[in-house]
C-alpha cells in the first residue's frame, strides 16, 4: 500500500465526494478477470487488496482507490510466424498472392485461436484523492497508467476536472537554483544524485550518482547552460525521493523509522494495521505536497 511513485494532478474546479457516493460510483466499473476471448480487462478493485472488502478506503476525508489491469500475453513473433505459415499455405494452394485485407483477417483469426491458451499478467495502480489539497496523487511512474486510472474514474463519476500539476516557475529552474545554492529549501535536503540536461534540444545529458553535488565538477556543467531535471532529495527524516522536472516523483521511499510508527499495533489485526498505515502515509503525503508547492514557488493559476 505504501506509495512508491507520484504522478500529480490537481482539480481545476471545486471537488468533493463522500466515501459512500464514491464507492457506489466505482461499483459499476469493478474489475473482472479476462474471459477466453478477452485481450485485456480493466476495472476498480479493493483499495487495500486481499485484506480489504471495499473499493474505497477513506481516512480523514482522504480516499484510496485501486485499479487492476489484466492483459493476455501474445508474443508478436508467435503471431508473425503463424501468419506467415498460414499465408504461404493458402498462396501455394490457390496459386495467388493474398491481399492485405485477407492477411489482416487471417491475423485476427490467429489471435482469436491463441487467446484461450495465452498466459496473462496483472498489474495494479493506486491513487489517493485529497479534496483538502484539491489534488489526486497516482502511485505510478507511468503517465499512461495514471491517465488510464483517471479516465476510468472520470467515466465512473461522469466528470473529473483534473489537470497535471504545474508550477508558476519551471521546476528545472528551481532545481538548478538549489544546486547552485548548494542546498534545497527546508525541510528538503539534497542528496547525492542528479541529472543535468542542456537547454538545447539536442544537447548533452550528464548523470551523477553517489557524488557530492557541491563539487566544482558538478557545478561546472551549470556554467555551460545545463539545467537540473532530476534531483534526489530527503523530506525531513521520513521520505527519500527523486524529484523530476515534469513535477513527478520517482523512487518514493518511506524510512523504516517512519513506517515503524504503528508497530505498537502489531499485526494480529491486519485491517487495523493497514488502516493505521494508510492514515500515517496520507498525513505525510499531504505534508510533502504542502512543502513541495512552497519550495517550488506555488502552483500555476488555473482557469476555473
Swiss-Prot record:
The keyword Nuclease does not apply. GO terms for biological process: DNA recombination; regulation of DNA recombination. The keyword Cytoplasm applies. GO terms for molecular function: double-stranded DNA binding. One of its GO terms (cellular component) is bacterial nucleoid. Pfam families: RdgC. NCBIfam families: PRK00321.1-3, PRK00321.1-5. Belongs to the RdgC family. May be involved in recombination. This is Recombination-associated protein RdgC. The gene is rdgC.
